[in-house]
Amino acid sequence: MEPMPSATDGGDRSATPSGLSASQRRAELRRRKLLMNSEQRINRIMGFHRPGSGAEEENQTKSKPLDSDILNPLGVPSVSKRVVLGDSVDGGVTDYQPSGGADIRGAQLGDKLDSFIKAPECSSKDGVELRQRNRGDLTADSAPRGSHHGLEQYLSRFEEAMKLRKQLISEKPSQEDGRTTEEFDSFRIFRLVGCALLALVVRAFVCKYLSIFAPFLTLQLAYMGLYKYFPKGEKKVKTTVLTAALLLSGIPAEVINRSMDTYSKMGEVFTDLCVYFFTFIFCHEVLEYWGPEVP
């Protein structure tokens, strides 16, 4: 009667290693579920999908029930079928209850972890679907808007080009007629006469002591101050091919007018310099020819 409990003890001892290996495998499964590929999670959050991601997810979902089916028979410890005495049965049951409770607790924890993992995955999938729908709507709306905006811009520029072409055609005959008679305003004549007189004065009195360009710069500063006291004539803006090209390229007309005004002022200063320098050289040559003793 005594050797029978020893057999049951041997059966329990042989069952404990199999229980430990099953718990290790279960823990490994939980760890794999928790430590999913970080790159896949980031792709799900950001909304990027690889072409093979769907197949991988299906394979993972298929492998999960297979692993659970494999682990279920391994998780049940081996219990001896021979029942001899009530004491031995009670002993076997009492020996088995702790391992069964641990398995139940482990299964509950695994279910909680699975639900905790699946919830963010579902929310991320819903967010990805919403993002994809929003992106699809945006692209569908932006495509006709972009084409419509481009068509309007093209038509507006075409109309501007036609207007500028007509303006150029109308200005060409008037420019050809007015080439011989160029109108000079009073301030322009005053500037040219002043530059010529300054050149004579500099050659006669200041040439030996100062630079010939210092008085010219002083005269230009005086012209800048006296400009507002002279009546301003109406300046006709001449439309050229360059201004037409600038307008068609999208540059505002105000910027073009300002730049043209700046260039016209620079041209006026250059004209004054040419008159001043030519008059100075002419006077110098005349004085050298008629009076060599004159300094």
UniProtKB/Swiss-Prot annotation:
Cytoplasmic compartment spans: 1-188, 228-268
GO CC, alphabetical: cytoplasm; endoplasmic reticulum; endoplasmic reticulum membrane; GET complex
Annotated compartments: Endoplasmic reticulum membrane
Positions with biased composition (Basic and acidic residues): 127-138
Stretches of the chain found on the membrane's Lumenal side: 207-208, 288-295
Keyword terms of this UniProt record: Disulfide bond, Endoplasmic reticulum, ER-Golgi transport, Membrane, Phosphoprotein, Transmembrane, Transmembrane helix, Transport
Coiled-coil intervals: none
Regions of compositional bias (Polar residues) in chain numbering: 15-24
Record field: transmembrane: 189-206, 209-227, 269-287
Any one Pfam family match given in the protein's UniProt record, by short name: Get2_like
GO biological process: B cell homeostasis; epidermal growth factor receptor signaling pathway; negative regulation of proteasomal ubiquitin-dependent protein catabolic process; negative regulation of protein ubiquitination; protein stabilization; receptor recycling; tail-anchored membrane protein insertion into ER membrane; vesicle-mediated transport
Tissue specificity note: In the central nervous system, expressed in astrocytes, microglia and neurons (at protein level).
Topology of this chain in the membrane: Multi-pass membrane protein
Region (Disordered) residue spans: 1-73, 127-148
Quaternary data: Component of the Golgi to ER traffic (GET) complex, which is composed of GET1/WRB, CAMLG/GET2 and GET3/TRC40. Within the complex, GET1 and CAMLG form a heterotetramer which is stabilized by phosphatidylinositol binding and which binds to the GET3 homodimer. Interacts (via C-terminus) with GET1. Interacts (via N-terminus) with GET3. GET3 shows a higher affinity for CAMLG than for GET1. Interacts (via N-terminus) with TNFRSF13B/TACI (via C-terminus).
Function comment: Required for the post-translational delivery of tail-anchored (TA) proteins to the endoplasmic reticulum. Together with GET1/WRB, acts as a membrane receptor for soluble GET3/TRC40, which recognizes and selectively binds the transmembrane domain of TA proteins in the cytosol. Required for the stability of GET1. Stimulates calcium signaling in T cells through its involvement in elevation of intracellular calcium. Essential for the survival of peripheral follicular B cells.
PANTHER family: CALCIUM-SIGNAL MODULATING CYCLOPHILIN LIGAND CAML (PTHR15026), GUIDED ENTRY OF TAIL-ANCHORED PROTEINS FACTOR CAMLG (PTHR15026:SF0)
Name recorded for this polypeptide: Guided entry of tail-anchored proteins factor CAMLG
The species this protein was found in: Rattus norvegicus
Gene: Camlg
